[in-house]
Amino acid sequence: MPKMFGTDGVRGLANRDLTARLALDLGDAAVRVLGDAGTQDDQPEGRRRALVGRDTRVSGDFLASALSAGMSAGGFDVIDAGIIPTPGVAYLTSVLNVEIGAVISASHNPMPDNGIKFFARGGFKLPDQKEDDIEAVLGQDWDRPTGAGVGRVSHDQTTATNLYIDHLVATIAPLNDDKTQPKPLKGLKIVADCANGATSVVAPEALRRAGADVIVINASPDGYNINKNAGSTHPEQLQAMVKATDAVMGVAFDGDADRCLAVDEDGNMINGDQIMGILARAKQREGKLNHDTLVVTVMSNLGLKLALKDMGIKTVETAVGDRYVLEEMLKGGYSLGGEQSGHVINREFATTGDGTLTALTLCNEVVKSGKSLKELAADFPQLPQTLINVPNVDKKAAATNKRIQDAVAREEELLGDTGRVLLRPSGTEPLVRVMAEAATQAYADEVCTRLAKIVAEELAL
């Protein structure tokens, strides 16, 4: 039986794969497994609590109701925070000291999909073992509470949203002694593309409260338009709007706002690697880059690593996935990490990737440095990269096939320190991703094509 939990919770087509019954069962199983993490006495009035948030997908309504029903039937009082970014749920799980945080979202996936993921007390994503434990008791009968032992469900989106926005703004603009709010982004004209998703209220408000002049696009969610030709996966509108309005820069979020990409004044995309480079250098300057190290994944561009090396900043690599980045950060005591896709984890303020936090800190660095985003990003040039997916192959054999490994070694020797190659099996499909980086796009294409041909010949099913 395949695992239900993937790299980012349970996902699938809403009402087909991810049904109300499954959401109910997940809520029921989660309180059994995660409820053991605390005691009744450490919560107000002796009640255990959970918090549920969701993105703007229409299916989020019935899934939130079902998930909350499962948890309240298990004896937990549930706070329904309504539509709120995923990192907002993580933050509130920590600051409100609830035992379980739950998010209903499929992030950057199309609208018909949805997902459920959990945060443990403290706002951290669950380790694999806890997800396995939830899956193991899914749908089982147990001695559920009755009478006064069952939980209540309360709805308070306004309070939850305001607490989160206050936190975000305070990361770059802590209140003055007289309780007035500084405006560090005053005069900064930016465009924010909210993907018609969970940060449609949060990001514009946080940026404005920090002083920015914000032009907002794709912030009118109707339940059906999340990520539709908008946000970080479709930045064309943002690029055009930045140029049309003479904005200094633009920021784009995905549906649940755990990632952020940017656009410079000329409409050029600034990816997660470049954003991480800019923020790592800023933290180093302020003495806040722990161990002078940035945590990245194997997909981060070699150009980033070479540029950081020249600045005296080390990099530590992990597997692809923000959960693996966070694991390494916690293990090594690092303060900043992330992915090329725009997941950036700033442990000074967050326990997970936070797109709105990334946007605020990036805008703040533009102001503090006195440079444009284009100038800042130019210090982190990206090597040309080519990626080819080779389908219908025995992906597990790629690491042991002699001809493939010999070919990889040969290409790496030829590239030296001017490029690299990477073979990565897909986690969900019978395919191998072949990636090459080189000094020129033509050479990257050439290397990638050669290797992809050998992979197809050797591993064909």
From Swiss-Prot:
Pfam families membership: PGM_PMM_I, PGM_PMM_II, PGM_PMM_III, PGM_PMM_IV
PTM comment: Activated by phosphorylation.
Single annotated GO MF: phosphoglucosamine mutase activity
Positions bound to Mg(2+): 107, 254, 256, 258
Top-level taxon: Bacteria
Record text on cofactor binding: Binds 1 Mg(2+) ion per subunit.
Enzyme class: isomerase
GO terms of biological process kind: carbohydrate metabolic process; peptidoglycan biosynthetic process; UDP-N-acetylglucosamine biosynthetic process
Active-site residues, as the UniProt record annotates them: 107
Modified residues (Phosphoserine): 107
Keyword line: Isomerase, Magnesium, Metal-binding, Phosphoprotein
InterPro entries registered for this protein in UniProt: A-D-PHexomutase_a/b/a-I, A-D-PHexomutase_a/b/a-I/II/III, A-D-PHexomutase_a/b/a-II, A-D-PHexomutase_a/b/a-III, A-D-PHexomutase_C, A-D-PHexomutase_C_sf, Alpha-D-phosphohexomutase_SF, GlmM_bact
Function: Catalyzes the conversion of glucosamine-6-phosphate to glucosamine-1-phosphate.
Cofactor(s) needed by this chain: Mg(2+)
Protein name, UniProt field: Phosphoglucosamine mutase
Enzymatic reactions: alpha-D-glucosamine 1-phosphate = D-glucosamine 6-phosphate
Organism: Bifidobacterium longum subsp. infantis (strain ATCC 15697 / DSM 20088 / JCM 1222 / NCTC 11817 / S12)
